[in-house]
Amino acid sequence: MAPHLLHVFSTFKLGGPQRRFVQLANAFGPSYRHSIIALDGQTQASSLLSSDVEAQFLTFQPVKGRLRPVANLRAIWRLLSEQSPDLLLTYNWGAMEWTLANRFWGFAPELHFEDGFGPEEADGRQLARRVWTRRLAIGGRSGLIVPSRNLATIAGETWRIAVENTHFVPNGIEVERFAGAAAGRCAIDGGVVVGTVCALRPEKNLGRLIRCFSQLRDLPVTLQIAGDGPERLPLEWLVRELGLADRIQFLGHIDDAAPVYAGFDIFALSSDTEQMPYSVLEAMAAGLPIVATDVGDVHTMLSPDYKSSSVVPVKDEDGFTEKLRQLVRSPSGRQAVGAANQQFVRQHYSLERMVDCYNRLFQRAIDRGKHNRLPAAMAQTAA
């Protein structure tokens, strides 16, 4: 029987961690069985799973109130005992209670993923409570997986996670799917399309992108924003306030982003915090030049030949605007930078490389866990 993997997400709405899981599950096919918990009950990303993926969604209702910590830990222990997974995989801060529960009782070998930070830690300052919780929870039995060198450094220097327990695995992508969709790219009515793809959340700081775009009124350029989220209404209000409603389009939620990238001429990333954003890899695969804030590993992801023309300090809106302006004015420049980005992502960020790396990590953790599992009687007592 295929090994049983239990995945715990704060949400299974489509985002970077969910997109990566879908890629891996589809690539693994029937090699693993998956049980998935979305703590908020949202499971929209499940529609992207292939038919040969054996996956079930489990319900878990976190307890709220004064007795929450003890009640939740007991409920987690009970579910882990019932499911008896060969490997527990927990994703980001929202699943940290599960890592804590498994830390002390060792129901299953575990790999914990950290993909980045929300707006409360976007400025690089770590919240002390979270630092200590991560040290305690991840620092025991769990292996830690991070997609960026920046996070690997934080894990060692701030969270004090042992180097041998920290695994840096860059995200990978189906390059040809995006390259093929973009092969027929052509200008729309002679104009240039700047685009971005992201969840409309505060840390994405799309207000910055809109303000920078507003300085390009003298050029034949439009802006397309693909994605949805809580910031949409404030952003639409900002667009109207700046008198840009006829030049900025909100595309809403997108299931298949490849055709969307094919309609862009330039990709823009205006985030306050990222680590290794999938959107940048997708834009590179689509052969796009990129203007981005210098967050996470973005400066190492892009073609080294054009980093200086692509990345600006986070708060440098004038610099961001100027790099957009230069690319809008230069069709040959866009083509050269986009081609270099596409070649670089092919060489360094293939899906095949990522899948192979994760398969080896999963198998190693499962094999190690066979010798270190909590005895069934103790598991029942804990639950």
Question: Whereabouts are the PLM-identified features?
Answer:
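A conserved mid-protein helix/loop that constitutes part of the nucleotide-sugar donor-binding site
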Residues: 15-23, 192, 196-215, 230-237, ...
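A conserved nucleotide-sugar
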Residues: 31-34, 206, 210-250
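Short His-centered aromatic/hydrophobic patch
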Residues: 90-96, 114
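Carbohydrate-associated surface elements
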Residues: 150, 172
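Aromatic "clamp/platform" in nucleotide-sugar-dependent glycosyltransferases that forms part
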Residues: 253, 272
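Conserved acidic donor-binding segment of nucleotide-sugar-dependent glycosyltransferases
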Residues: 304-318, 326-331
